[in-house]
Amino acid sequence: MNQQENNFVLADIVRALRQEEVIAYPTEAVFGLGCDPDSEKAVNTLLALKQRPWQKGLILVAANYAQLEPYINDSMLNEIQRETLFSTWPGPITWVIPARVETPQWLTGCFDSLAVRVSNHPLVQQLCAEYGKPLVSTSANLSGHEPCRTEEEVRIQFGPSLPVLSGHVGGRLNPSEIRDALTGKRFRQG
């Protein structure tokens, strides 16, 4: 696929996001399902598609830290905690950070924090930059199924109508590690 074709596909995916659709896209280890984090309709569609309870909360993936700032309470982090985050980004570490009071519950679930990551996958970087904000990010798989690692697997699990950003997953074998930004506690091994 040449760059011009990829841009056309990217433009279609951005258009789908603006129309509050759920999309699939390659990440560092698996394909992700994503949508506009500010659209309750899109998030509810994603949760229903994934068969995931809203109470668990979601992850936001971004091109840079500035895209995450409207959703997280950065003032709760001290300089050392912030430096620790920045030393792992862009990269496969997801950090749980206190959320802003106005961050929608459809993102935080039953928590007062939000899981966020600045991705180093070039297509995720490009997609978030083009869209202008982060995306909800959860692994593309139905409950009880393995996460999808190819476009074909996405089509098998979710059907042909789901918009999929063409591309390949990165070389990681495991999903992102998840850590608490305040305590350093590891919630999920990467």
From Swiss-Prot:
The keyword tRNA processing applies. Signal peptide: none annotated. It is an enzyme of class 2 (transferase). It comes from the Bacteria. It is found in: Cytoplasm. PROSITE patterns: YRDC. InterPro entries: DHBP_synth_RibB-like_a/b_dom, Sua5-like_dom, TC-AMP_synthase, TC-AMP_synthase_SUA5. Residues 7-190 form the YrdC-like domain. One of its GO terms (biological process) is tRNA threonylcarbamoyladenosine modification. Keywords: ATP-binding, Cytoplasm, Nucleotide-binding, Nucleotidyltransferase, Transferase, tRNA processing. Its EC number is 2.7.7.87. GO terms for cellular component: cytoplasm. It catalyses: L-threonine + hydrogencarbonate + ATP = L-threonylcarbamoyladenylate + diphosphate + H2O. One of its GO terms (molecular function) is tRNA binding. Belongs to the SUA5 family. TsaC subfamily. Required for the formation of a threonylcarbamoyl group on adenosine at position 37 (t(6)A37) in tRNAs that read codons beginning with adenine. Catalyzes the conversion of L-threonine, HCO(3)(-)/CO(2) and ATP to give threonylcarbamoyl-AMP (TC-AMP) as the acyladenylate intermediate, with the release of diphosphate. HAMAP family: TsaC (MF_01852). This is Threonylcarbamoyl-AMP synthase. It comes from Yersinia pestis. The lineage of its organism: Bacteria, Pseudomonadati, Pseudomonadota, Gammaproteobacteria, Enterobacterales. The gene is tsaC.
